A protein has these predicted regions:
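Short, basic-rich loop-to-helix N-cap that marks the start of a DNA-contacting helix
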Residues: 40-51
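Residues within the helices of the helix-turn-helix
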Residues: 9, 20, 50
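A short, Lys/Arg-rich alpha-helix, primarily the initiator
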Residues: 1-17
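Short alpha-helical DNA-recognition segment
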Residues: 17-35
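Short C-terminal boundary/hinge segments that cap the last helix of small helical domains
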Residues: 57-70
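Alpha-helical residues within the helix-turn-helix
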Residues: 13, 24, 54
Length: 70
């Protein structure tokens, strides 16, 4: 089975936004956002995903990617 990964790093670079600023806008800690950014979590709440999309002015599909097993 494949997996879903978050590509926050690309969108953050495009938006010229640092981790601390995004964490503050989303309302979560730097540590938790770092775990999300580095795909070290197994689940993300839809409310958190929506807040990230609001802060980065993007759609969920812009930061979510499906990777097939190789």
């Amino acid at each position: 089975m494949g997996k879903i990964v978050l590509r926050l790093d690309r969108m953050m670079v495009e938006r010229k936004m640092f981790l601390n600023e995004l964490a503050e806008r989303v309302g979560i800690s730097n540590v938790n956002l770092s775990k999300i950014k580095n795909n070290k979590v197994t689940a993300v709440r839809f409310t958190t995903l929506a807040a990230i999309c609001d802060a980065l002015d993007c759609e969920a599909g812009d930061i979510l990617e499906y990777q097939k097993d190789s």
